[in-house]
Each structure stands twice: as structure tokens, then as C-alpha cells.
């Protein structure tokens, strides 16, 4: 649920100074048609993703559940179940508006007071059936209240079996997209993604990461997260504040990120979907899916906030896989594909720089 995502992230964001916030007022204002344009984009990427996935598995179509928010807004939830390609997947669009801003946002952006707010976004989680195809997660969102606005989101990949060429292709596609807008976007947002999708109690990343960003309004430093001593913050501090980028600049970047999903992921599907697997691979996939559940229920701010504030439970938990298993003190056998996942793929790597001959 979008308002859950916005409020949860705003309640933990504490690194944007009041000076930079005040500088937003009166400058870099969104265009008059900003909301309509972002809404159209969010719907378009939902449509294009669903259409391409249905082409890849023509026997199983997404079922749409449209809903309306009495206070203003609504959305389209699309879910596929028990497909040949996707065991379960969801691609959701939502947009909401209203007069009452969440206190957590007003505390961070006081100049938003007195303005109506608007928020929209598209989110997606795909759980493939074949263990050799990675799970993938995408989320892009936009918030606006008068002179205050920002974009956030990202995309990350969670493989169950280690294929360097897949991780490299995914990251290179994202890096190429980011580099077309600014050379510091990818290194910052890649590090931010590794930081966010980390299971502290397991001391491992959720997968091979991707990119993650929030509070991007074209001003100040790129990193706006809570880990002030982490690699993303260190890199962001090193490059300093970037020149002001316009609303159009940031929107163009987010559009390109959304459009990069299919070329980043579909080639992996096509490369792995016909690979045969047995009980061993299926059992390991279900075991590793447990990490996805653990992250969402223990660390994901949107999930936690939604459950604590009586949000729509079915929507909040829709990202969870349909089947999962846990095993006490599981250890992969040495020198296996499963152990390689732990040794290499669940630690931050510079996948965009991977060279095949080094594998």
C-alpha cells in the first residue's frame, strides 16, 4: 500500500537538513501536470510488465483487482498464481491524494503544511517456479505536496542458484541506465541497495542487489538513508552535493529505470526457464525463500508499518512467496552451487565489473 510505503520511509528519514528542505520552496517546483504524467507512467510500466510476462506464459494471465480509497485515490492490483513461469507474482499500481498529511512527513518537510498531498507508485514481486530463475522485486514511487516532492524506489534480484552472467547482466543494464543520467547514480544507489536489503541476523544480503534510492528531489547529496557511516553515505559524502537537477531530470531518470526492468530480467528468464531441476534444487529454493519472508517481516519498513497501523493485510503480505520451508541449522555442502551462493552471491560484489574469464 502506497501511503504505508511513503509514511514508513519518511518516519525514518533523518539526514536531509532543514536548510536543504527550505531551499526547495520557491524553486524547482513540479510542473502543473506533474501528477497526471507520473500517474500515466506508473500505469504504463504496470501494463508493459504484465503484457510481457503474459507473452512469456500465455496460458496464465494476471487477474486484476481494482480498488478505491474513500479518502481519495485507488489502484489496480494484478496477481498471477500457479503459472508455468511464475508460481506467484504481483504487479500493483496505486495513487492516493488528500488534505491530511502524515505527521512524519510534516516533521521532515514543514513547508508542505497547508498543501494537499499526492502519492503514486508501482510495485512488483515475481516468484518464479524454476529455481534457476531469480526472484525479482521492483518499486517506484512519487510524492508531492505543494513545493515538496520526491521520487524513490529501486529494483533488486534474489537468485537461488549462482550464475555470474545473470547478476552481471542485471547490474550492467541498471548501470547503463543510471550512467545515462549521472555517473554517480549507480555507485551510490547500488551501495544503498546492498545496505537496505541486508539481513542483519543472518549476516547476508537478500540477494545480489540492484539499485535503491529515496527522497530524490534534485538537490543536495544523493544518499538520504539512515546509515551515516555506511558505504553509500561515505561515497555520497565523497562526491558531495550534486548540481541542482530539475523535476524533469529526476522524472526522466525514474522513467528510464522503470523501462530498464524488462531488458534486465527477461533475458535471464529466457536463459534459465527450460533448465531441468530436481527435488534438491526445489528444496533449496523453498529454503532460501524463507530469507525473503524473514526480510519482509523483520526489516521491511513498509510491511512493518502497514501491519502496525491496521493496513490492508492481503495487500501488505502479497509480496510473500506461496511456499516456503525452514530447516534447523542448514549448512550447504562444500564446493557446491549452494555453497557458492553463500560464499559469493550473498555478499556485496561489483557485478557490473564482472569478467567472464575470472569466473
Kindly give the residue locations of the regions a language model identified.
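Short conserved micro-motifs at the rims of enzyme active sites and ligand-binding pockets
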Residues: 104-106, 222-224, 304-310, 328
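C-terminal, helix-dominated tail/subdomain
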Residues: 281-325
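Gly/Pro-rich turn-and-neighbor structural signature
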Residues: 30-109, 239-278, 282-292
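Long, contiguous internal "core" modules enriched in hydrophobic/ aromatic residues
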Residues: 149-275
Amino acid at each position: 500500500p502506497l501511503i504505508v510505503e511513503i509514511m514508513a520511509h519518511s518516519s525514518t528519514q533523518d539526514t536531509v537538513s532543514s536548510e536543504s528542505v527550505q531551499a526547495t520552496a520557491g524553486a524547482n517546483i513540479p510542473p502543473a501536470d506533474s501528477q497526471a504524467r507520473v500517474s500515466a507512467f506508473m500505469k504504463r510500466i504496470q501494463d508493459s510488465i504484465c503484457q510481457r510476462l503474459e507473452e512469456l506464459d500465455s496460458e496464465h494471465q494476471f487477474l486484476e483487482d481494482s480498488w478505491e480509497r474513500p479518502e481519495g485515490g485507488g489502484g489496480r492490483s494484478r496477481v498471477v498464481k500457479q503459472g508455468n513461469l511464475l508460481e506467484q507474482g504481483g504487479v500493483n499500481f496505486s495513487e492516493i491524494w488528500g488534505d491530511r498529511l502524515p505527521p512524519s512527513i510534516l516533521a521532515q518537510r514543514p513547508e508542505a503544511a497547508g498543501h494537499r498531498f499526492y502519492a503514486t507508485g508501482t510495485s512488483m514481486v515475481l516468484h518464479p517456479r524454476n529455481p534457476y530463475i531469480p526472484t525479482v522485486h521492483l518499486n517506484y514511487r512519487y510524492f508531492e505536496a505543494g513545493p515538496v516532492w520526491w521520487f524513490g524506489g529501486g529494483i533488486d534480484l534474489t537468485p537461488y542458484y549462482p550464475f555470474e552472467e545473470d547478476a552481471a547482466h542485471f547490474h550492467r543494464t541498471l548501470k547503463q541506465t543510471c550512467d545515462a543520467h549521472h555517473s554517480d547514480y549507480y555507485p551510490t544507489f547500488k551501495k544503498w541497495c546492498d545496505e537496505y536489503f541486508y539481513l542483519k541476523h543472518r549476516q547476508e544480503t537478500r540477494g545480489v542487489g540492484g539499485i535503491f534510492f529515496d527522497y530524490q528531489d534534485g538537490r543536495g547529496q544523493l544518499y538520504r538513508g539512515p546509515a551515516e557511516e555506511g558505504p553509500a553515505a561515505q561515497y555520497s559524502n565523497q562526491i558531495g552535493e550534486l548540481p541542482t537537477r530539475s523535476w524533469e531530470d529526476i522524472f526522466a531518470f525514474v522513467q528510464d529505470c522503470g523501462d530498464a526492468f524488462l531488458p534486465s530480467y527477461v533475458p535471464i528468464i529466457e536463459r534459465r526457464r527450460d533448465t531441468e531441476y530436481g527435488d534438491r534444487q526445489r528444496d533449496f529454493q523453498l529454503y532460501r525463500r524463507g530469507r525473503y519472508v524473514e526480510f519482509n517481516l523483520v526489516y521491511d519498513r513498509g510491511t512493518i508499518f502497514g501491519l502496525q497501523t491496521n493496513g490492508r493485510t492481503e495487500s501488505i503480505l502479497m509480496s510473500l512467496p506461496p511456499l516456503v520451508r525452514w530447516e534447523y541449522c542448514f549448512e550447504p555442502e562444500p564446493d557446491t552451487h549452494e555453497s557458492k551462493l553463500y560464499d559469493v552471491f550473498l555478499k556485496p560484489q561489483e557485478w557490473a565489473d564482472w569478467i567472464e574469464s575470472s569466473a
